[in-house]
């Protein structure tokens, strides 16, 4: 029994030593990964300034290649690609909703089509996906929340929209404040930068531009931890939270803008009236056309009414119709009632 007890204590001591050694290695690794100038209150020499400059420049090309301009309707913002398949992080107030069609403009002007995924209306976090085939240039994002106040950072964005001649705007600064759902830097941001990336000096995305404070030097960003907290929901196109950055669709508020009646000669609904410049007319539906399907089901007044009763302004309804010999199918975006 005495021998067994001693052997157990020896194993305990070895295990503790192994754990301490492992934690020590992690600590050393973390220290090794941390750039020394982040811990200086201010740069003390020309060498310090050169080190900051070289760190940013070594990561700038890749960062620029993954930073995109997002064109949604008549507005534009910025975003950053974080996967070769084309997953983009941006701000909720840029996408404005779930399922929005987006034109994604690369640094060289190449355009791809995409669709907005989920968003968090409380924190201003949002995702979208490029729907065309990749691979696309991308950058890594911070998964460990390793940045600290005072760390040097740089921001990228398409200020005022895409401008090939000007290129992407780059600003350098430091983290100056941190709150639960926001980090603040002194990188100057203006309109069009919203949704763009904030990088640490190792080239990882640590935040997404949200808004400007009392002055242009007080820039607010959504930290990556806020994306990670709801990552799966955002990827699944969920509308998360309630807040000022996006308006949640109210069921039954969506307006299609057409009147129909049961067709006597063929199965479906005959269009009898259209609201001028309404959603149905914009989609190409004409008076006299025959609605064949609503959301994949045979078109009836009951199905159309019940489906619209579940959808709000900004959401889409799948309509299949025929006009003469041509059959069309389209997601029609609903609007506010006039």
Give names to the regions the model predicted:
Residues 137-182, 190, 212-220:
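Flexible, gly/ser-rich surface segments that form the specificity/activation loops bordering the active-site cleft
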Residues 80-81, 188-209:
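Catalytic nucleophile loop of clan PA
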Residues 76, 83-125, 130-135:
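Catalytic-histidine neighborhood of serine endopeptidases
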Residues 53-57, 66-85, 110-113, 138-140, ...:
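A conserved glycine-rich beta-strand in the N-terminal activation segment of trypsin-fold
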Residues 34-60, 102, 136, 159-162, ...:
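C-terminal cap/linker of serine protease catalytic domains
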Residues 194-197, 264-265, 275-290:
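PDZ/PDZ-like domain micro-motif
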């Amino acid at each position: 029994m005495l021998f067994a007890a001693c052997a157990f204590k020896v194993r305990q001591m070895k295990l503790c030593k192994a754990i301490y050694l492992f934690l020590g290695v992690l600590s050393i690794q973390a220290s090794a990964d941390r750039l020394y100038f982040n811990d200086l209150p201010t740069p003390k020499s020309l060498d310090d300034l050169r080190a900051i400059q070289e760190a940013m420049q070594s990561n700038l090309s890749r960062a620029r290649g993954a930073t995109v301009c997002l064109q949604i309707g008549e507005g534009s913002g910025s975003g950053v690609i974080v996967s070769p398949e084309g997953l983009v992080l941006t701000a909720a107030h840029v996408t404005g909703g779930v399922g929005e069609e987006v034109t994604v403009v690369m640094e060289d002007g190449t355009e791809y089509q995409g669709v907005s995924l989920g968003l968090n209306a409380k924190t201003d976090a949002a995702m979208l996906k490029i729907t065309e085939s990749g691979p696309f240039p991308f950058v890594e994002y911070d998964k460990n929340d390793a940045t600290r106040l005072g760390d040097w950072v740089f921001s990228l964005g398409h200020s005022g929209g895409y401008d090939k001649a000007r290129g992407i705007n780059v600003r350098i600064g430091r983290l100056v404040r941190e709150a639960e759902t926001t980090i603040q830097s002194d990188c100057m941001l203006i309109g069009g930068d919203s949704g763009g990336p904030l990088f640490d000096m190792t080239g990882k995305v640590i935040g997404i531009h949200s808004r400007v404070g009392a002055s242009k030097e007080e820039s607010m960003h959504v930290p990556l931890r806020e994306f990670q907290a709801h990552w799966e929901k955002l990827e699944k196109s969920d509308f998360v939270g309630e807040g000022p950055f996006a308006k949640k669709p109210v069921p039954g508020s969506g307006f299609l803008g057409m009147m129909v009646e049961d067709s006597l000669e063929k199965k479906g609904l005959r269009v009898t009236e259209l609201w001028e410049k309404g959603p149905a007319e914009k989609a190409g539906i004409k008076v006299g056309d025959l609605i064949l399907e609503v959301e994949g089901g045979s078109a009836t007044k009951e199905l159309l009414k019940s489906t619209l009763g579940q959808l709000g302004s900004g959401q889409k309804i799948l309509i299949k119709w025929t006009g003469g010999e041509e059959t069309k199918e389209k997601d029609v975006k609903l609007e506010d009632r006039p």
